Amino acid sequence: VDMGVPELDPPAIPFQATEAASLYDIDVNGQVQRIAAVSMGNPHAVLTVADINTATVAELGAALESHERFPNRVNVGFMQIVDRSEIKLRVFERGVGETDACGSGACAAAVAAIQQELVDSPVTVHLTRGPLKIDWKGAGSPLIMSGPAKTVFHGRIRI
């Protein structure tokens, strides 16, 4: 799937910053967190963590989601670098909480990791519901996302 060109310019994300950078320091409840800010049509903050299994996704995700520097709120990705070709990711989605999968979040994490030269492209992003492969050639280029599609719910509605 062509996911489009990621937006890295702070006003377009929207994110309040004086200039564009690959990482930003942001105060969250008295502690400085280092984040990447990316828009994939929706805003994402991506943090690199040592272990996604011990990351405080609910607490820190909620605090960042409504941070004043993101006027439209933000999705928060907790990214663990496995090696140059793999990332593990948990996503706290704005207005929802933690989700099992997030294509735009996987793309935002890939952009953040590639920009910081932590991984190469293509990179596999492992989410709870399965892996996604993200290919990005760099600034100004669209991201290509591929992965399995699975049914997670069947239902009926009477109208």
Question: Whereabouts are the PLM-identified features?
Answer:
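Active-site proximal loop and beta-alpha junction motif in alpha/beta enzyme cores
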Residues: 1-101, 111-159
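Helical hairpin unit composed of two closely spaced alpha helices linked by a short loop
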Residues: 104-106
